Amino acid sequence: MSLVSQARSLGKYFLLLDNLLVVLGFFVVFPLISIRFVDQLGWAAVVVGAALGLRQLIQQGLGIFGGAIADRFGAKPMIVTGMLMRAAGFATMAMADQPWLLWFSCALSALGGTLFDPPRTALVIKLTRPHERGRFYSLLMMQDSAGAVIGALIGSWLLQYDFHFVCWVGAGIFVLAAGWNAWLLPAYRISTVRTPMKEGMMRVLRDRRFLTYVLTLTGYYMLSVQVMLMLPIVVNEIAGSPTAVKWMYAIEAALSLSLLYPLARWSEKRFRLEQRLMAGLLLMTLSLMPVGLATSLQGVFTLICCFYLGSIIAEPARETLSASLADPRARGSYMGFSRLGLALGGALGYTGGGWMYDTGHSMNMPELPWILLGIVGFITLFALYWQFNPRSSAPAVAPGG
């Protein structure tokens, strides 16, 4: 094995362990926020949704700046600083007894993510070859699912005692992750050239195809973020206990660990990336629309299974497609900007979802938010089809690319 291949192999193992810490730290805390502040403290869902949307908007919306800084100065200092800021945000959340303090803690957590997320994503592109990238994304997502259920289990168990413990454990994991990166992460340059910040950002903003693709994903993310807001609330309402939420993440973990990698291997040889993305989004859309009509835990979990299956189909294709459209001379900037769709979709999905949930209940129409989300899903499908329609533009990436 050549030195380059050995470095790539060791780098991928490092990324897997680093990703596990980040996922654990996040999911110990965030799935419990809506339960803590809406169900336990009685806050309005729109208030908590606004806090979650603010985090999404700041972290992903400012990602291009975090990526551009990493293009200029390298990945390591940005990752370590960002993880320590995320830890500080979680520690502050433990003291949140008023909405402004929850919003502040979410904003601080988001700024940390703005710094560490784009360079970590760019490192995946740097350390993987194009032909293996889709499968490595699948491994990361399998790990995300396992980490999510373990984190949610830990968080649910800690919530029985005190929400302070939930936040402190999450903060501690991010401090550990920061130390891990400070100690072992080499001083990688994530782009092929040391690109000035302004040049990297302008290179992205001039790429109209990439801009269109990223903005189109806003609707996709409006649906996907409901696993952190409305789906846990619905599960908790029907079950009458927050402990049932952990089974929602257990379902995701079981499906991901058993199906994600085989599905990615099978579909990458038969379908284009954009076809896989649209097929997954269609299933997600059809699964969310009937949620408001479900009256049993079995019915809700069946729909959640279908939703997760759609996500399993779509996510590896979405990540690989984003990476394939990025200019290697400004990877950090591209990966940072690619999160803008998540920023807009997250902000609209959380805030709008919270508002729709409150409105639907006040009008005695619990199905209202889910029907509106379904409409958003179909509009997004049409936009993706228009963008990648071979009759109007060249196809994005061939199968296996």
From Swiss-Prot:
<feature type="transmembrane region" description="Helical">
    <location>
        <begin position="214"/>
        <end position="234"/>
    </location>
</feature>
<keyword id="KW-0472">Membrane</keyword>
<keyword id="KW-0997">Cell inner membrane</keyword>
<dbReference type="InterPro" id="IPR020846">
    <property type="entry name" value="MFS_dom"/>
</dbReference>
<dbReference type="InterPro" id="IPR036259">
    <property type="entry name" value="MFS_trans_sf"/>
</dbReference>
<feature type="transmembrane region" description="Helical">
    <location>
        <begin position="368"/>
        <end position="388"/>
    </location>
</feature>
<dbReference type="Pfam" id="PF07690">
    <property type="entry name" value="MFS_1"/>
</dbReference>
<feature type="transmembrane region" description="Helical">
    <location>
        <begin position="139"/>
        <end position="159"/>
    </location>
</feature>
<dbReference type="InterPro" id="IPR050171">
    <property type="entry name" value="MFS_Transporters"/>
</dbReference>
<comment type="similarity">
    <text>Belongs to the major facilitator superfamily. DHA1 family. MdtH (TC 2.A.1.2.21) subfamily.</text>
</comment>
<feature type="transmembrane region" description="Helical">
    <location>
        <begin position="244"/>
        <end position="264"/>
    </location>
</feature>
<keyword id="KW-0812">Transmembrane</keyword>
<feature type="transmembrane region" description="Helical">
    <location>
        <begin position="340"/>
        <end position="360"/>
    </location>
</feature>
<keyword id="KW-1133">Transmembrane helix</keyword>
<dbReference type="InterPro" id="IPR022855">
    <property type="entry name" value="Multidrug-R_MdtH"/>
</dbReference>
<feature type="transmembrane region" description="Helical">
    <location>
        <begin position="99"/>
        <end position="119"/>
    </location>
</feature>
<feature type="transmembrane region" description="Helical">
    <location>
        <begin position="13"/>
        <end position="33"/>
    </location>
</feature>
<keyword id="KW-0813">Transport</keyword>
<protein>
    <recommendedName>
        <fullName>Multidrug resistance protein MdtH</fullName>
    </recommendedName>
</protein>
<feature type="transmembrane region" description="Helical">
    <location>
        <begin position="277"/>
        <end position="297"/>
    </location>
</feature>
<dbReference type="GO" id="GO:0005886">
    <property type="term" value="C:plasma membrane"/>
</dbReference>
<dbReference type="InterPro" id="IPR011701">
    <property type="entry name" value="MFS"/>
</dbReference>
<feature type="transmembrane region" description="Helical">
    <location>
        <begin position="34"/>
        <end position="54"/>
    </location>
</feature>
<feature type="transmembrane region" description="Helical">
    <location>
        <begin position="165"/>
        <end position="185"/>
    </location>
</feature>
<dbReference type="GO" id="GO:0022857">
    <property type="term" value="F:transmembrane transporter activity"/>
</dbReference>
<keyword id="KW-1003">Cell membrane</keyword>
